[in-house]
């Protein structure tokens, strides 16, 4: 199985300006992300960016990059342009790794790509991890996902799903008699596998009302009838970088 890792990166960030170029132990963060991705079995890893500064920094560290337009309304549009620039075919698989995940597990990248390859009925794949703390279930910044019997996504939400009616807001998965037989809540991990043909189609689909309500782009795929396969990982995902505090924590791993 061959697949390509694409890492979208742009300098505009409201909470952390110039985030992709933030220094992490002598290399920009986007380079650290690419270096982790290059430890996967991907045939190639490419940064997709609208910044010549990012292109130059990647080149200095031997990381492939492609220059895209600056006016893309979403990361999906940027990835679709990158697929065309790279000459990828519609049946090829790409994995979208976020440019602010310098601790991404290479094995997780492989798992997401492999799952999509094994599920021809799905247009996308992603990952999830079990939730252990009630605070995370209730936190709207922690996106939850519920699955069907084949581990295909039924819905993603910022609200606590599933809602356990009989447990009065308590962590039912800690109930040794009844709750342990029920599904644990799952936290969505923001990594996506796409078939290139669908990735090219995705930006042309009208935004879904539920997507706008939840501010979750993946709901557009479900709304329009496309399936998303979900890999459940036993390893908690490494921390992403959205704020200066996140950056300080992540830098500890790159002395």
UniProtKB/Swiss-Prot annotation:
Residues annotated as signal peptide: none
Disulphide bonds in the chain: none
Catalytic activity, as annotated: 3-deoxy-alpha-D-manno-oct-2-ulosonate + CTP = CMP-3-deoxy-beta-D-manno-octulosonate + diphosphate
Biological or metabolic pathway of the protein: Nucleotide-sugar biosynthesis; CMP-3-deoxy-D-manno-octulosonate biosynthesis; CMP-3-deoxy-D-manno-octulosonate from 3-deoxy-D-manno-octulosonate and CTP: step 1/1; Bacterial outer membrane biogenesis; lipopolysaccharide biosynthesis
Transmembrane segments: none
Keywords: Cytoplasm, Lipopolysaccharide biosynthesis, Nucleotidyltransferase, Transferase
GO CC, any one term: cytosol
Superkingdom classification of source: Bacteria
PANTHER family xrefs: 3-DEOXY-MANNO-OCTULOSONATE CYTIDYLYLTRANSFERASE (PTHR42866), 3-DEOXY-MANNO-OCTULOSONATE CYTIDYLYLTRANSFERASE, MITOCHONDRIAL (PTHR42866:SF2)
Entry function: Activates KDO (a required 8-carbon sugar) for incorporation into bacterial lipopolysaccharide in Gram-negative bacteria.
Name of the protein described by the UniProt record: 3-deoxy-manno-octulosonate cytidylyltransferase
Organism for this UniProt entry: Polaromonas sp. (strain JS666 / ATCC BAA-500)
Taxonomic lineage: Bacteria, Pseudomonadati, Pseudomonadota, Betaproteobacteria, Burkholderiales
């Amino acid at each position: 199985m061959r697949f390509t890792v694409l890492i979208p990166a742009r300098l505009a960030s409201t909470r952390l300006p110039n985030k992709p170029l933030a220094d992490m132990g002598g290399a920009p963060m986007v380079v650290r992300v690419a270096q982790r991705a290059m430890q996967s079995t991907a045939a190639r890893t490419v940064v997709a960016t609208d910044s010549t500064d990012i292109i130059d920094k990647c080149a200095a560290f031997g990381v492939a990059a492609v220059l895209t337009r600056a006016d893309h309304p979403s990361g999906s549009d940027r990835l679709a342009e990158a697929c065309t620039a790279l000459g990828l075919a519609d049946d090829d698989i790409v994995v979208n790794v976020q440019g602010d995940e310098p601790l991404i597990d290479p094995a997780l990248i492989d798992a997401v790509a492999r799952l999509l390859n094994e599920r021809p009925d799905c247009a996308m794949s992603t990952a999830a991890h079990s939730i252990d703390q009630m605070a995370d279930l209730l936190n709207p910044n922690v996106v939850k996902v519920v699955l069907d019997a084949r581990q295909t996504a039924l819905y993603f939400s910022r609200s606590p799903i599933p809602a356990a009616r009989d447990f009065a807001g308590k962590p039912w998965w800690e109930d040794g008699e009844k709750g342990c037989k029920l599904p644990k809540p799952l936290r969505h991990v923001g990594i996506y596998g796409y078939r290139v043909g669908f990735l090219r189609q995705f930006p042309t689909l009208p935004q879904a009302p539920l997507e706008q309500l939840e501010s979750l782009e993946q709901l557009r795929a479900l709304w329009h009838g496309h399936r998303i396969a979900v890999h459940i990982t036993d390893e908690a995902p490494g921390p992403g970088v959205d704020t200066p505090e996140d950056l300080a924590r992540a830098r500890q791993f790159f002395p």
